[in-house]
Amino acid sequence: SSAASDVYKRQLVCEVIDELDISGKTIAVEPVGCAVTAHNYFDFDVVQAAHGRAPAVATGIKRSLPDRVVFTYQGDGDLASIGTAETVHSAARGENITVIFINNTIYGMTGGQMAPTSLPGQVTQTSPYGRDPKIQGNPVRVCEMLATLDGPSYIARVSTDSVPHIKDAKRAIKKAFENQINGKGFSIVEVLSTCPTNWGMSPVEAMQRVRDEMIPYYPLGVFKDIEDVEEDK
């Protein structure tokens, strides 16, 4: 299921929090969507936000409790759709929060409808003949869009389809948390994920789809890192 495929991403987040020894001061903000039950897996404080509003809630918590480490954990149907305004403006302001963005190109919890990230030609409950860019528009590449802003400190897209990519994902997530600890501002890590149930695939087939279809459209890498800019000066 989508929720089951999401577990490993949560594990990476928890490993990073343990390694940084910050669980006692960490506050997570969970969305509406498959990650709405994230509090069952996190052994630290968790707040639930209204649909798409997690970055706004995280902003309020961080500004009122600046010594806490605050992060959101959101899917693409939450962050890239109803939450677009909150995502863009928290990034533009350079809010000192961390955003973990799980992109599986579909609305998982509500039964498999087309998301802003659904690929061209992708069959969903609301695009039964495949997404047609002429009718439903083109997918939103969140990292590339946010990288045009001055506010973010770190923007990366990763995947967990292979051991090397899992290691890269953990490094990116760790950096996103370290940036917040060091007061560097807004960081977002997009993690390409699967939803075997709503894709109508086996887990193995779904993982192959990530490699064959998602990564070519959503290339992995770092799209912005203020450390690179500082080193160039």
Residue spans of the language-model regions?
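Short, small-residue-biased leader/transition segments that mark boundaries at the very start
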Residues: 1-8
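Flexible, low-complexity linker and terminal segments
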Residues: 2, 181-233
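N-terminal glycine-rich anion-binding loops that anchor highly charged ligand groups
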Residues: 9, 21-38
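Thiamine diphosphate
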Residues: 30-108, 171-175
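Glycine-rich beta-alpha junction loops
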Residues: 32-34, 104-106, 162, 190-198
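Short, hinge-like loop/turn segments at secondary-structure boundaries
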Residues: 45-47, 90, 115-119, 205-208
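Conserved thiamine diphosphate
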Residues: 67, 115-182
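Active-site-proximal loop->helix
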Residues: 84-89, 109-123
